[in-house]
Regions:
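An alpha-helical repeat/solenoid feature that recognizes helix-turn-helix modules
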Residues: 164-170, 174-177, 214-215
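Conserved small/polar residues in nucleotide/adenosyl-binding loops
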Residues: 216-221
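Generic alpha-helical structural context detector
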Residues: 173-176, 190, 194
Length: 221
């Protein structure tokens, strides 16, 4: 079996608000930015097509703002069969707070979202009388969860989700106050070893060798 912390389903979010955008798309706000997938349940008709788009922020007019996704589509399309059914994307995940759905009326579908991240246990917690600091701690924790999906990434929403070595090098000391990361990081360091170049150089992303330049090259003997 593969060594490491498996990616599993965690928090389940219900929409905190449901609105209709000017173009008719139904916008669901889950109240938290996270990495995961949508889950819809409905009484569908054969051939009915439902499209779900994802975004972290909204435009002033209430539509999804996908500017920062670059070329990522962050879109799931589902074709229904007759009868009651539940759909959730497989073999992928998105970084989002908002989901826009077309192809089904909001009163005809149950919508929720599931956070996905590596199964790392909490190692510590922080709470104080200052709500701004509490929010900062919450943001730090959720940023870690969203970027601990099998490898340490720098963002969960864009058109690349690489294991940037510099980012985790900076963040690991902080993350270890919040999470037990031994299996997660040991597995990734095995990936780093596997990607190390003959001259000692380490790519700036692991485990995608050759993406970008070298981060570090050891001196020649």
């Amino acid at each position: 079996a593969e060594y490491g912390a498996p990616v599993t389903a965690h928090e389940v979010f219900k929409p905190v608000t449901v609105t209709t955008a000017p173009d008719g798309e139904t916008i669901y706000d889950f109240g938290q930015n996270f990495a995961g997938v949508i889950r819809i349940s409905l009484q569908g008709s054969a051939g009915q097509v439902i499209t779900v788009r994802h975004a972290e922020i909204l435009n002033p007019d209430g539509t999804l703002n996908t500017t920062f996704l670059r070329s990522a589509k962050a879109t799931a399309t589902y074709t229904c069969r007759d009868g009651k059914q539940t759909y959730s994307p497989r073999f992928t995940y998105m970084g989002f707070r908002y989901a826009g759905i077309k192809g089904v009326k909001p009163e005809d579908v149950e919508v929720e979202a599931v956070a996905l991240y590596s199964d790392v246990a909490h190692a510590g917690a922080f709470h104080c009388s200052n709500e701004l600091l509490n929010r900062l701690q919450s943001n730090i924790t959720w940023s870690a969860k969203s970027n601990f999906v099998d490898i340490p990434t720098d963002c969960p929403q864009r058109d690349e989700r690489m294991g940037w070595t510099g980012d985790i090098n900076v963040f690991a000391p902080t993350a270890l106050y919040n999470f037990e990361l031994s299996r997660f990081l040991e597995k990734w360091l095995r990936d780093v070893k596997a990607e190390q170049r003959p001259g000692g150089g380490i790519p700036n992303t692991v485990p995608v060798q050759g993406y970008g330049c070298l981060l570090y090259t050891s001196p020649s003997p």
